[in-house]
């Protein structure tokens, strides 16, 4: 039995078994990958402030796979996103309360959560009737904002700190159709308190309600590293925990899950897992370059 299966078994034993016919809140989604960019052109030109999505720069940062891995990993992300979308929009199952607010976290740094956040966003925006807002919720280490070159732009913390600031003014379109980005914003010594505030709840409710077909994906700080991530978990409707295969210990996975509400769906995503389905070896979450860069923080 794997480390992840052991963690889930212990957690389910402590929290009670799942009722017959009910989907467990603690699914193992055993893969990560990337989606290919849409081939068709946008119906209209992108806005002037649209954030450029430089694939070469993102690959160099370890946040996109190399071209030769795209097809295999794209298929894996299709498997990952489906239950997330179904819970968010109530497709084939009752919608999860605030299920379109999805937090992507890890127990500790180096698991690949930022890689997961970006590539899940790119895959999900390919849906015909779904748009995506990717939020840099790692206000301690806003790597996504830095890589996209918007680390100095007002963002999440600013709009929570200043109620007079329009939410729409800090949501930035990107050059990728169907994908927008909300930077982390300017750092704050009381970031945890801001994320746990009533104002934060108001902000995420507005983000969730503006477009019923929008998924809001939060790239969060590691759960066991900061208190900011635990505050962010309070407003998310569903949570994905990225676990690096062969490295993350069982007790860390279990400890991370224990910080979360029992009432929210929590899924584990096994990252950098080598499998051999249909004769292929897949390695998830790695840049794939010689020497193997980590897939993000």
Label for each model-derived stretch:
Residues 1-297:
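P-loop NTP-binding module
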């Amino acid at each position: 039995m794997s480390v992840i299966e052991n963690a889930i078994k212990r957690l389910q034993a402590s929290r009670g078994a799942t009722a017959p016919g009910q989907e467990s809140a603690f699914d193992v989604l055993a893969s990560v990958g990337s989606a290919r960019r849409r081939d068709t052109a946008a119906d209209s030109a992108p806005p002037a402030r649209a954030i450029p999505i430089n694939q070469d720069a993102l690959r160099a940062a370890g946040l996109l796979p190399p071209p030769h891995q795209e097809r295999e990993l794209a298929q894996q992300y299709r498997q990952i996103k489906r239950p997330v979308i179904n819970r968010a929009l109530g497709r084939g199952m009752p919608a999860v309360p605030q299920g379109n607010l999805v937090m992507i976290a890890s127990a500790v740094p180096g698991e690949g959560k930022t890689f997961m956040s970006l590539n899940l966003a790119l895959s999900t925006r390919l849906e015909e009737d779904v748009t995506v807002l990717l939020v840099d919720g790692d206000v301690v280490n806003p790597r996504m904002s830095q890589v996209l070159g918007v680390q100095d732009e007002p963002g999440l913390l600013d709009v929570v700190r200043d109620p007079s600031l329009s939410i729409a003014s800090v949501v930035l379109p990107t050059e990728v159709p169907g994908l927008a980005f909300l930077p982390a914003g300017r750092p704050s010594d009381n970031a945890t308190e801001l994320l746990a505030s009533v104002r934060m709840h108001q902000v995420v409710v507005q983000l969730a309600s503006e477009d019923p077909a929008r998924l809001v994906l939060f790239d969060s700080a590691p759960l066991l590293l900061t208190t900011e991530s635990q505050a962010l978990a309070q407003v998310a409707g569903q949570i994905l925990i990225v676990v690096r295969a062969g490295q993350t210990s069982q007790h860390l996975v279990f400890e991370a899950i224990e910080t979360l509400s029992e009432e929210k769906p929590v899924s584990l995503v096994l990252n950098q897992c080598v499998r051999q389905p249909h004769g292929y070896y897949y390695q998830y979450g790695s840049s794939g370059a010689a020497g193997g860069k980590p897939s993000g923080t």
